[in-house]
A protein has these predicted regions:
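Amphipathic, hydrophobic secondary-structure cores in small proteins
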Residues: 20-66
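N-terminal acidic leader/helix
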Residues: 1-25
């Protein structure tokens, strides 16, 4: 399991990234951010991608249940 600080930072970055994606319409921005993170820290990249995926999955699940 990742260091709690890594998870916290990844969660913050995921929230910020998804907000920018909504504002700009760049649906794959998170992939570019993940690549930048991965160049420095594979651990941070994995935590960030996990944070993004869980948020996207939760949103899709919520949309499905709302139908």
């Amino acid at each position: 399991m990742a260091d709690p600080t890594v998870v916290e930072l990844a969660n913050q970055m995921a929230e910020e990234c998804l907000a920018v994606q909504r504002e700009t319409g760049q649906e794959r921005l998170f992939m570019e951010v993940a690549a930048v993170l991965g160049a420095s820290s594979q651990t941070m990249e994995e935590a960030f991608v996990t944070a993004i995926r869980t948020r996207l999955a939760a949103a899709q699940g919520g949309d499905f249940m709302a139908k």
